[in-house]
Amino acid sequence: FGKILRDLIPAGDVLSDYVDTLTHESFDIGLAGLINGSIDAVLQLGTDDNPQLWITDYKSNRLDQDGDDTLIAAYGQERLFDAMAHHHYPLQALIYGTAMYRYLRWRAPHLSNHSDLVKGFSYFFIRGMVGPTTPPNTGVFTWQAPPGLWQRLSDRLAGGAL
């Protein structure tokens, strides 16, 4: 998955450092824990003519540490990404996205360009979402997939070339 991401995401993408983890020769993680759960929700945004599906997952991780001024401070983008990478949530989301792509191909063959229907994923860290006073982007990690990603990942899982 890492090599495919390396080909598709632009330099400076928020997942660039995680791609380094995925492509490092020492990377070895069992997939059982990543695919044991389920997608919490798939949200349809966009229009009827241009539907956009977003994979969402809710997390209850405690990210606050001694020395944090406020609970909200623990759920800013930098800390969210550290938690995402530590728990391999980006890899989990890539597996979810590929599964959604395959499901659409199977159950909705009349739709065109299944790979571009699945726009990306959002992880909602609910402890950092404290109501209407929550600052924008606090507690929410969102990533938009590059065009063609899901098809390439699906092909790879089917034994295709990188």
Give the label of every model feature segment:
Residues 1-162:
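Structural signature of nuclease core domains in nucleic-acid processing machines
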